[in-house]
Amino acid sequence: MPVLVETIAEFKTGKPFQGMMVGFRLHLEPKTAVLIEALLAGGAEVIAMGNEGTTQFGTAEVLSSQGCEVLDRPGQGPEATAVHLSRVASTGPDLVLDNGAELIGACLDNASPPLGATEETTSGAFRLREDHAGQVGFPVIVINDSPLKSIVENKHGVGESVVDTIVRVTNMSFHKKRVVVYGYGWCGRGIALYAQRRGADVTVVEIDPIKALEAAMDGFDVAEPSVASTTAEVVITATGRPGVVDYPAIEQMPDGVLLANAGHVDTEIDIRQLEQQAPGAELSPSLKRHDLSNGKSVFSIAEGRIVNLAAFGGIGNPIEAMDLGLTLQARSLAALVDP
């Protein structure tokens, strides 16, 4: 990761975060560990938490040995997220590096608000601009708005790693598979592109008419959900919104359909309702079969969590893509301190 390593060298000399506490919420895996190394090199104290299902605990142990306080523990349940958010917010961080805007939200009631924050995701940008509109009294740099991140990390990094992870988890070929991609933002663009490169017949579902037009001009079929889902063999969500594919929609899908989510939130596909109605039988790590009451079978990956990180063996985006995106995070935090 040469760009981030160069940043680390600069931070060691300049110490932009000397004496500051950074609240860190991002997937904890080897690439993001280098970002934490950059913050520590810059003089920061770091208290870190990951996202449910994506923390690599070997990485967490290494970070702890380097002086970063890591809250995640093996075997923790979903309730740990709220506990950890509260714990990080209670330290009164000077800076926040967030992934989903939940940590920023937890800091809004602090007596001393952060100097500023960065937000990594589309989901977090939605939350800030909608749920927290007018409530955030400090600057937030949405890294996802950068064209550098959009093109390099979201389109090509996410697109390549999502399709590659699905192939490895299922051991199936994409050739002539009918793949439906929900969402044609930058991640959806990339997923559609890389699925097509693997030989899939791709249909895009997109509610924004301009993006839907772009998908059509890019050569993809565009259809309403009720039409696209009835022929799908693989469904991949990438919208950053909850409730995109509900259980009634799953019931209408063809027998043998595979469900995977590439968005930040694990509720884009209603896996919880699917599990209640048709508990999954584990076929292999991260892959389940659900036998519906209507006689159909549905397959799901990683319980609806972000597939390229939460699935067994998922290693996230290519290291070159993350080098650029994580450098944007580090340098954006430095810019908030010294604009």
Where are these regions (language model features)?
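Adenosine-phosphate binding glycine-rich loop
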Residues: 1-4, 21, 29, 138-176, ...
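ADP-ribose/adenylate-binding Rossmann-like module
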Residues: 95-98, 111-125, 250-291, 299-300, ...
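Rossmann-fold NAD(P) dinucleotide-binding segment
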Residues: 6-9, 13-16, 37-40, 101-105, ...
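A short helix->loop->beta-strand "cap" motif at the edges of active sites that frequently abuts
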Residues: 43-45, 68, 112-114, 136-138, ...
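Glycine/serine-rich phosphate-binding loop and adjoining beta1-alpha1 elements at the start
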Residues: 1-17, 50-177
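Structural alpha-helical scaffold elements that stabilize or flank donor/cofactor-binding regions
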Residues: 88-89, 227-228, 252
